[in-house]
């Protein structure tokens, strides 16, 4: 008997991750793509069978498909998963396929309220669950500031509108090499001020406002303050933010379970000392009550119960191995000897973020395909 098969948009699968619901995923991409990057959740089971192995039918895998769990078929763009889900439906299984495939999954954003700020202000985190990117929006008295926006610019603009806020400031904590920034485009569309660390902007081909320590930015007519903290190490210009004396937006310098990598501009040996100084001196001198909000997460276990990613600085100094290496030489070896593979198309991404090249939307999607690779564990 033929059963239903339907398309699920990424938001439905996203909710299963946040709600820790069970899901069985049949991933029909090739083995290398699957092992490199897949949809992960607390109670997700996977079966990877390349689509080309299923062209003659699904009979050989039927006994591996559970009947007591929701089944989602996944491929790169959608087409292959539609065909496989149709075959499984014909064989009597109720399944669904991921609309848009992994390309759509990599672009989905989930907004999560992190907390309240002074005088009615709010802090939001945008979780790009398929890529591990984290962006932020500070809203106060009808104004909004965005930090480390991804290229899905209309999502941020529409979100601010929905909150009745005008975007007045857009920041990038550093020149990104793992994903395409939406900061400059958002600023152009909304007439907001675009801020970028000048030491990361020496080759950019557009106008920007230099983001420098000592120049605090006030959001709204209230007392919400964004305080830049020069924190090199991931890049030479990396700059963190203290927001409302509550939150430390650490960019790609410090994550929940890992630390930033210093090599995406080919400068690992030169910048590892800056990375250590930022983590072991600059951050050590900050209030341990600050909640660290990074620009990436590595694993699903880093998500809090409400779906946000963030932990108190004191907890990270206690639990994060990268913050607890007393010997400087050992730290240097940890960083330079354990560098993960470079992000996909990272040099093209850097050039895009400098304004040197302007790839079309489809090319931008291709450039970003793959997992987060900004951390050292």
From Swiss-Prot:
Lineage: Bacteria, Bacillati, Bacillota, Bacilli, Bacillales
GO MF annotations in UniProt: sulfur dioxygenase activity
Organism: Bacillus subtilis (strain 168)
Protein's name in the database: Uncharacterized protein YrkH
Gene from which the chain derives: yrkH
Record-linked InterPro entries: Metallo-B-lactamas, Mito_Persulfide_Diox, POD-like_MBL-fold, Rhodanese-like_dom, Rhodanese-like_dom_sf, RibonucZ/Hydroxyglut_hydro
GO biological processes: glutathione metabolic process; hydrogen sulfide metabolic process
Enzyme active site: 75 (cysteine persulfide intermediate)
Pfam family, one: Lactamase_B
Superkingdom in the source lineage: Bacteria
All copies of domain Rhodanese, residue ranges: 19-114
